[in-house]
Amino acid sequence: MWIRSRETMKKVLQKYWAWAFVVIPLLLQAIFFYVPMFQGAFYSFTNWTGLTYNYKFVGLNNFKLLFMDPKFMNAIGFTAIITIAMVVGEIALGIFIARVLNSKIKGQTFFRSWFFFPAVLSGLTVALIFKQVFNYGLPAIGNALHIEFLQTSLLGTKWGAIFAAVFVLLWQGVAMPIIIFLAGLQSIPTEITEAARIDGATSKQVFWNIELPYLLPSVSIVFILALKGGLTAFDQVFAMTGGGPNNATTSLGLLVYNYAFKNNQFGYANAIAVILFFLIVVISIIQLRVSKKFEI
């Protein structure tokens, strides 16, 4: 009897044990992701300050105020600049460097590790390092070599700070796309490229007609990652420029932080976050549908 009950218990455990590994992560995701997400969406229709449990339902008033807020429009402009730069830069540079690393060059393993190195650093660390470079390193070089535009910190001017922010985000952001594109290139059957070269295809023709179509799924992944990275840029910008000078480098993510934690306008900040969420979703869906038409 005892043996039979033990066997029954063993069968029950075998049957439901796997479900535990599915249910527990889903439960944790619901608690720490979906619940806060829906709470944030709800609070975007209120004037909640984040300091008390008291709030008043204001409907769409937060969203109406957003489009009359010069800080929001300025943040939209800067975020658009860094997002476009990251999407174009990560795809173009990622494919170019991945093709170089995929070719037969000496020290291939070293260069792969070298280009991936920025991905393992925290954004805050990278930003603080480059802040010192832009504030002290480049001006010292500019003074030594009598290069006028380098004699003052890039972070002190509007377009200099924007350039610095884009450069740092792209320097760190391109590391992962290189690995993704490299994996995509190595998945292309060598028989196809060899046959094309035997038939007289140039390197440019091989890229446009064979490699690029095979890389489109990788392009879709990198596009979404770069889009998300650009639209939600925060830590590098916060640590390096703080949104300055004169709010020139205030991203949407930084604006959410400022309104929520500096001005105690959590309802208003959540309204910005909701718009940001829908921007990412809509653009990602459009991109995925367009790219599927060209995939092999």
Predicted regions and their residues:
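Short, Lys/Arg-rich, polar N-terminal cytosolic tail immediately upstream
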Residues: 1-13
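A structural signal for multi-pass alpha-helical bundles of membrane permease subunits
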Residues: 10-296
